[in-house]
Design a protein with these regions (language model features):
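Charge-dense, helix-prone N-terminal extensions
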Residues: 1-100
Length: 100
């Protein structure tokens, strides 16, 4: 999945708006983070902790949690390796969590 495809998908969800910079765009719903591009291959996504663990188990090559994020509702998606459907699923989880 490319950064442009991430943006197109995220912005297709109701209420999602793009913020950030050209190099590091971020997508928010109700001013709450859904996802943020760290670099062209790494996307940080807000995900509820129980769902994050399931995502990591199902897709260990495409997702990870660096030590600095372990206590947070976040996961990194490695866009060159992650299944596009799993990335969309994670974005959906973030959108559901943040729109409440």
């Amino acid at each position: 999945m490319t950064p442009d495809e991430v943006g197109q998908y995220a912005e297709s969800l109701p209420g999602v708006r793009r913020k950030g910079t050209a190099d590091q765009p971020a997508w928010y719903v109700r001013d709450r983070l859904v996802a943020r591009l760290v670099d062209p291959q790494t996307l940080v996504i807000r995900v509820p902790l129980p769902r994050r663990e399931a995502l990591l188990e199902a897709h260990p090559d495409g997702f990870g949690v660096p030590p600095r994020m372990e206590a947070h509702h976040k996961v990194e998606a490695y866009l060159s390796r992650a299944d596009p459907g799993a990335v969309r699923e994670a974005i959906d989880l973030a959108w559901e969590m943040q729109r409440r």
